[in-house]
């Protein structure tokens, strides 16, 4: 067994492995004898099948299993001897030029290792903390949003405008041909909710029910569907149905629809304020987290195993496909992990750095943190106690929460060391959303 440090990238390693053919054959013989009493072959009584026939039928399979196990054992011994932390699954390449005449099976294992990470000095991190006071204006804006969420829709003859619900057929053509995800029938969407690309939505605005139009638009260069990203596409849209929103009045019935059983409007406003404060606190925390995470990436520079990047990119692509399917779109077969390589590299790199930070400073999860996390999460539901009981009814559910708390512990540790600068923001700035990338 030889180990080599030669590598085509800083994290790649090669190990030369040698497994004795005699050792393989001996173990194969032992296993075939153990298997023989269980083998059933027509013409022979159970347990009386000759070993030669057992070997003819199962020898190759057993040899493959034995060689694989011995090879994996040798590989494990080699990486332990070198103190390698293997990332992903190794690849094994046969090195036998004449397998029949060889006294041993020769293989080269190629794999990547996790990088050594030096965290360095993290005390110089500076973050801007959003500051927002909740007043009547913020409560009223939230009320308006809640009314829009509970709007009913009625057909209208006027031109389409933001806030309307439209039902459309659309067909997209690229170089005279259709493309995956570029067509749909009776697709309903509310204009202005961020579910459509801006150029696509702006072409619907001003249309009337029954109208059909054709227009050209260019997909963003970073659009997930690589077949159309950055390309000019021709779309034909037919507006089948146009409906205008009708907002509910702010009265006792509206309060009851928000879970205020008595229909007390003042109590409703108080609950809105409490919920709004909780959401604002979460958003502020998210903003702080984004900044300290970026600071970590800027300050701790490491190499990342390519195999981990590829795994994460493929996972993100599958996640996108499932998301499209859940919204009624057909899966885009052209969507591959290649589109997500940059995002995947960032996520993997950040995950490795966070793991090092958590281990170095022993940022373990405490039972009271789990309880606090679940209780805060449950406040967003109508029956918090039921949500809490549901989580504690399953150890697996509690286990799923631990990574979130570990990450939060890391953020808290970094914020304790960071310089925090208060920065006033508006309600719209803090609560705003970005446009989605759907067609």
From Swiss-Prot:
UniProt-listed Gene3D superfamilies: 3.10.50.40, Trigger factor ribosome-binding domain, Trigger factor, C-terminal domain
Enzyme Commission code(s) on record: 5.2.1.8
Single GO term (MF): protein folding chaperone
Top-level enzyme category: isomerase
Keyword DNA damage found: no
NCBIfam families membership: tig
Protein name (Swiss-Prot/TrEMBL): Trigger factor
């Amino acid at each position: 067994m030889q180990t080599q440090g030669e590598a085509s990238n800083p994290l790649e390693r090669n190990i030369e492995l040698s497994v004795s053919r005699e050792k393989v054959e001996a173990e194969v013989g032992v296993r075939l004898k153990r298997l023989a009493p269980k083998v059933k072959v027509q013409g022979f009584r159970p347990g009386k099948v000759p070993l030669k026939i057992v070997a003819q039928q199962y020898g190759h399979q057993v040899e493959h299993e034995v060689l694989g196990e011995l090879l994996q054992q040798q590989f494990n011994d080699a990486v332990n001897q070198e103190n390698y932390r293997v990332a992903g699954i190794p690849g094994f390449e046969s090195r036998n030029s004449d397998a029949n005449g060889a006294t041993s099976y020769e293989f080269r294992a190629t794999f990547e290792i996790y990088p050594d990470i030096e965290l360095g000095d993290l005390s110089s991190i500076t973050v801007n903390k959003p500051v927002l006071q909740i007043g009547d204006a913020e409560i009223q804006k939230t009320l308006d949003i809640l009314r829009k969420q509970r709007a009913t829709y009625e057909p209208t003859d006027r031109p389409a405008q933001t806030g309307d619900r439209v039902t459309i057929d659309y067909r997209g053509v690229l170089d005279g041909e259709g493309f995956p995800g570029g067509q749909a029938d009776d697709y309903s969407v509310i204009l202005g909710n961020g579910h459509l690309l801006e150029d696509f939505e702006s072409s619907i605005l001003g249309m009337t029910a029954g109208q059909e139009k054709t227009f050209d638009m260019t997909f963003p260069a970073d659009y997930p569907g690589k077949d159309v990203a950055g390309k000019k596409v021709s779309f034909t849209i037919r507006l089948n149905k146009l409906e205008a929103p009708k907002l509910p009045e702010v009265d006792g019935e509206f309060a009851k629809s928000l879970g205020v059983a008595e229909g007390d409007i003042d109590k409703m406003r108080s609950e809105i304020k409490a919920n709004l404060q909780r959401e604002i606190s979460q958003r502020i925390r998210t903003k702080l987290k984004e900044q300290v995470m970026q600071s970590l990436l800027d300050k701790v520079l490491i190499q990342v195993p390519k195999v981990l990047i590829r795994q994460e990119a493929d996972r993100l692509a599958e996640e996108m496909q499932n998301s499209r399917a859940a919204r009624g779109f057909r899966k885009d077969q052209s969507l591959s992990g290649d589109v997500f390589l940059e995002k995947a590299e960032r996520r993997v790199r950040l995950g490795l750095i966070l793991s090092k930070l958590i281990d170095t400073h022993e940022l373990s999860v405490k039972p009271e943190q789990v309880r606090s996390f679940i209780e805060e999460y449950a406040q967003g539901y109508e029956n918090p106690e039921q949500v809490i009981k549901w989580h504690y009814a399953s150890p697996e559910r509690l286990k799923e929460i631990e990574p979130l708390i570990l990450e939060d512990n890391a953020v808290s540790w970094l914020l304790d060391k960071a310089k925090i600068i208060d920065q006033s923001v508006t309600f719209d700035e803090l609560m705003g959303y970005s446009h989605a990338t759907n067609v």
